């Protein structure tokens, strides 16, 4: 009732049950529907009520590869350009008991298979193998503490939610996803 009165939002009990039980089956959920139906609000307020860390990543139409989510190493400056997601993931490695929800808002405005492929693949493995290759270290590069041979771990309590609109401005989400 809190959301209905304070934010003009209402989720029926079955919607909330399906959302929560979906996380028991998979660490990746897609909420698909028409614009304005509360797809983004559900994970936002779920995180608020459960105390989970929630990061919203508004997907851009220009996203083409993993660098849009994970950042990239700049050979010229010898620095790693990190994203807000990578920073949050790195921080989550220091808080293994915290629940982290990463929301790809309007995920199908770009092709999911391009920018999210590495994460889709990793999430199919057992949780102890959840790590993503960020880079090969140059000879004189001093890596951050939580990177292991160029890989960053995805903590077990990490969950991914994609919101997807069903309209002419978006791509169809393939069966692979």
Model-found features: residue ranges?
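AAA+ P-loop NTPase catalytic core and its hallmark functional loops
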Residues: 1-177
């Amino acid at each position: 009732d809190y959301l209905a009165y304070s934010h003009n939002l209402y989720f029926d009990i079955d919607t909330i049950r399906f959302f929560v039980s979906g996380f028991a089956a998979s660490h990746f959920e897609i909420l698909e529907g028409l614009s304005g139906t509360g797809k983004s609000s559900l994970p936002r307020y779920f995180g608020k009520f459960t105390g989970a860390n929630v990061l919203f990543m508004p997907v851009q139409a220009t996203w083409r590869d993993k660098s849009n989510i994970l950042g990239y190493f700049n050979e010229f400056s010898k620095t790693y350009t990190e994203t807000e997601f990578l920073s949050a993931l790195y921080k989550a490695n220091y808080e293994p008991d915290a629940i982290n929800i990463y929301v790809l808002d309007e995920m199908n405005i770009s092709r999911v298979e391009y920018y999210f492929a590495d994460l889709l693949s990793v999430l199919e493995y057992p949780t102890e193998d959840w790590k993503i290759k960020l880079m090969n270290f140059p000879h004189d590069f001093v890596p951050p503490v939580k990177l292991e041979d160029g890989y960053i771990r995805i903590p077990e309590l990490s969950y991914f939610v994609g919101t997807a609109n069903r309209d002419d401005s978006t791509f169809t989400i393939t069966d692979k996803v």
